[in-house]
Amino acid sequence: MPIQNILLVDDSKTELHLLSDMLTQKGYTVRTAENGEEAMRRLAEAKPDLILMDVVMPGTNGFQLTRAITRDPRFAGVPVIICTSKNQETDRVWGMRQGARDYVVKPVVADELIAKIKALEGAKG
């Protein structure tokens, strides 16, 4: 199943801009949210094909939000890729335990991220 619509969740306007531009240039439709509350509103408006989730955010962090989304039946089948500067093995393992399907470390390398998205497309199909 192809991935077309992506929700980016990051409290950094710079990261949102960079990732949004990168993904838009590759043909994806991108919506953004700057925190957990806004992300949940965006999810209620339209279910994306993929969520790219930062970890360090005010309020609900990305690990907590990933757990909430992946356990919510309304969003069943929507994969989450953690996209963060946290590069410790314990962070990666914890992110996967919260329900993330993959983990990308910032600064994001475009080819790596696109390859991970394409791999998820194959897994969803």
Question: Where on the chain are the PLM-derived regions?
Answer:
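Short hydrophobic/Thr-rich beta-strand motif most characteristic of the beta2 strand and flanking loop
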Residues: G27-E34, R42
